[in-house]
């Protein structure tokens, strides 16, 4: 099992380096690997995804380094729920209210809304730390839906 600090430590690490391979070895499944299509013409370069569907985790690499990690706390996009710990507490136990109680006021965030281009946008908050950002999204009942760790350049 990987700990929350293992995931934070892995951010920014090389795709084929020992930190990342050590992380993968602790998953009980092989990843489904994909890349963003060339048609996206992303100025930041392609993103390579390692999808651990049964574990509820997706790793995104840009320029060969771990850029972000999505934790699907609730079943979504074919992913099973991530059933491990987030910040020392079972992922499914977090709510928007107790995130604020534990972490304080977020650096950014917004209420749920419907966007004309992308559709439903869930309530979210973002905390900025020295080496990474933490973004949390919540379902309509206020329960944690998805967590993303994002490496800082």
Where are these regions (language model features)?
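A cross-family detector of function-defining hotspots
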Residues: 2-65, 90-153
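Short basic alpha-helical hairpin corresponding to helix-turn-helix/winged-helix-like nucleic-acid-binding
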Residues: 60-86
């Amino acid at each position: 099992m990987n700990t929350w600090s293992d995931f934070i430590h892995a951010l920014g690490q090389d795709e084929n380096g020992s930190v990342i391979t050590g992380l993968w070895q602790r998953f009980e499944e092989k990843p489904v690997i994909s890349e963003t299509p060339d048609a996206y013409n992303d100025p930041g370069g392609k993103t390579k995804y390692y999808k651990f569907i049964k574990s509820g985790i997706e790793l995104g690499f840009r320029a060969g380094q771990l850029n972000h990690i999505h934790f699907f706390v609730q079943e979504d996009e074919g992913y099973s729920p991530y059933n491990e710990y987030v910040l020392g507490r079972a992922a499914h136990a977090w709510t928007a209210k107790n995130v604020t109680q534990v972490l304080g006021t977020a650096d950014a965030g917004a209420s749920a809304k419907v966007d004309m281009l992308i559709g439903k946008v869930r309530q979210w908050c973002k905390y900025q730390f020295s080496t990474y950002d933490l973004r949390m999204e919540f379902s309509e009942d206020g329960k944690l839906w998805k967590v993303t760790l994002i490496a800082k350049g």
